[in-house]
Amino acid sequence: MVKILLVDDSKFLRLATERALARAGYEVCTAGMGKDALKLAQEKRPDLILLDMLLPGMTGPEVLKALKKDPATANIAVVVLTGLSPKNASRLRDDGAVAFLEKSALGLDKGCDTLLSALAEIVRQLKLEVPAAQAAGA
């Protein structure tokens, strides 16, 4: 089962996305702050991190750099989520992000369909096992 750490300061977005990911067959843990994300990444060793860019205390780019600097978390794939324009996408990729998704295009109003489709493709590219529920289109 693919383990995902979802990091976003919006409780609503975390809950809605966590439910959709769990229904699709992913194992999910969540964090609302950057420092909590770093701790959970070390403890849970997720396969993938969905990381918001605007976090309180420690920004998404700071979290990304800290993850990639730590040998224990450096190999975890990080997908950047943001409500901002993708101006900085190439810099974030240079810092270690494997993909960049705009929150406005995630389909939160439709059960996160767009996110789940994009995530299934990213999981395939990373050669992780797509959950059976996701592969079946649930």
List where the protein language model places each region:
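Short hydrophobic/Thr-rich beta-strand motif most characteristic of the beta2 strand and flanking loop
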Residues: 25-32, 40
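Active-site beta3 strand of CheY-like receiver
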Residues: 44-50, 55
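The feature encodes the CheY-like receiver
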Residues: 56, 74
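CheY-like receiver
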Residues: 108, 112, 120-138
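Charged docking surfaces used in two-component/phosphorelay signaling
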Residues: 15-19, 23
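Conserved acidic carboxylate
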Residues: 8
